[in-house]
Structures are given as C-alpha cells and as structure tokens.
C-alpha cells in the first residue's frame, strides 16, 4: 500500500473510497480497532462536509513519522464558500445543513490533533492527526 493517497471528492461514492483507504492505512500502521473506527469516522465526516458544502474537493491520507512517533494524517481541502465563523462552527449543535451539529467538534474529539483554516469564498482546509499509542 502507498504511504499516501489523494482521493478526489466529486460524488457520494468517493466518501466511501476515502473511508476504505483510511481504514486500510490504519490497519497497516497498527492502529487498534477503536482507533480504526475513530479514524474512519473522522474521514467520513470531513469528506462528507466537502461533498455537502463545497460539492468537490480532495482528501489526502498519509502515514506520518515524526521522531519516534508514527501515525496518520488526513487533510481535506475544498474551494467552497468557506466558514465565516469557525468558532461558531466548532460549537456542539451548530449546523448550517439542518444536521446534528456534531461534525467538526466531533471530529476534533476523535483525533489527537485538529487544525482548520477557512477563508470566505475561497474554501476550507482541515488537517487531523492520530498517533499510535
């Protein structure tokens, strides 16, 4: 398996591909079942956001190695309308799509590191990482 893979998100089936690849990478890297589920859920949520809010974008999934730490990094990028108020978007229960509002804050809880950058009318980039314990 490659150490990184980019998946273009253009249709709902691409979300499934991103989930599958993330799970396979997590297994190869040695993550336990619970962390595999967390990683898969995070990829699902982030790629779903790309599809719902920007229609197209990409997910980059890659193995990480920093010093004696190993893990996985997921980066989602889109060129959608952006998030005007990131602080509000990170609050539990907030949603612009009539959802439960658990997406971004839930993803942050699932992963060890979470970073979001967004510019209105330019798009959003979310980077998350999970480290092997």
Give a label for each model feature.
Residues 1-41:
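Bergerat-fold GHKL ATPase/HATPase_c domain
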Residues 1-5, 47-133:
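Conserved beta-strand-loop-beta-strand hairpin that lines the nucleotide-binding pocket
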